[in-house]
Amino acid sequence: LLHHWLKSADWKSEVLWLPAFPLADKVPGTGRIWLRPVLRLSAPGVSRYYLDGRRPIINGVPSSLSGRVLYALEGANVIKDVIPQGSYSDHRFTIRWNVSVDENGSGSGEVSLHLRGGWIELMPEGESSDIKELLDSFIWPSGLQIDVANAAVEVLKDAYRITVPFSGMVAIPAGGQMLLRLPSAVPKDLLSIGNFAPPYRFLFPFIVEQEGRFTLPKGYDVVSSPPIRGGGKDVIFKEELKWNAKRRFLNSSYMLILKSSTVDINTSAELSDALKEMMRWNEVTVPFRKR
């Protein structure tokens, strides 16, 4: 209906089809392989862009189509339209913790999941969908109660942000000292990547990062910081810890960058090592002492 209406309004509108997986040449298929139609649009003075439901559009391409192959009929011929992947900076998944810690080691606050680019496809279909399924697809730190019932979803211009309250033990107190554990939430599907045999490719390169801000009780100071790692060639993994004594908060972060969507044997080894470092983050502790 929209296709015909746009054509009547002097737009050039073409219907393409998104398959569940790329199709080999001259291989028969059935109607079940097609996920949905996509419109390719252009008009005088308007650059060509794609319309895929209500998904956010970045540089003329909905995030859902990054790296995909679309198909259409041109007479008796099947034509392919390969959608650019974009840069790894276009596909960013940020998990951010904001935590207040008391002298008993109990913490409370919010954790937010910020999905940009191709990561938006993790979101369930439909505005009123229950996001419990998405949150259940993460490995959460033990000892924390994640309040899924009060999760809030924000629809941004080119992203989604989910904010979830939480509470639980984040530190071990003992006689004026405290051992703070840095919480980390990890998508289960990301960990399964280590089981793939190279070579293989993703739909797009990406960034996964985790950030935390921990506000400590008055009078506490850092005793020492754990060793910080960083480096890589095709897969970069870097960490950061900064203590602000005046404001009593600790900032922590790690960032995993996959620079190319194509993974060969060397990149696979780097990625496997980076994923291990990412999992280790949930075991990192920082000691504090009361002055």
Task: Give the label of every model feature segment.
Residues L1-R291:
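A sensor for short, sequence-defined functional sites
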